[in-house]
From Swiss-Prot:
This is Ubiquitin-like protein NEDD8. It holds the Pfam family ubiquitin. Keywords: Developmental protein, Isopeptide bond, Nucleus, Ubl conjugation pathway. Disruption phenotype: Flies die from growth arrest in the first-instar larval stage. GO terms for molecular function: protein tag activity; ubiquitin protein ligase binding. Disulfide bonds: none annotated. Covalently attached to cullins. It comes from Drosophila melanogaster (Fruit fly). The gene is Nedd8.
């Protein structure tokens, strides 16, 4: 089934998946098309963040559904310096 993944810039990526595909597999497909590593991706469907271990069917994703891609960027380490 064909679904769409919408990025924050509004770009829509069309991906062919199976209902039994896990979310981590969907993220791999996004990486193939956009070059974004799965660990930096957060997929949102119906207002909920999708768990990597669940399937598209678990979230009731159907053909024509639109998932929203959010980037999960990790912040740098903070360095504490004593005030003198």
């Amino acid at each position: 089934m064909l679904i769409k993944v919408k990025t924050l810039t509004g770009k829509e990526i069309e991906i062919d998946i199976e209902p039994t595909d896990k979310v981590d597999r969907i993220k791999e497909r996004v990486e193939e098309k956009e070059g974004i590593p799965p660990q930096q991706q957060r997929l949102i469907f119906s207002g909920k963040q999708m768990n990597d271990d669940k399937t598209a069917a678990d979230y009731k994703v159907q053909g024509g559904s639109v998932l929203h891609l959010v980037l999960a960027l990790r912040g740098g380490d903070s360095i504490l310096t004593p005030c003198v």
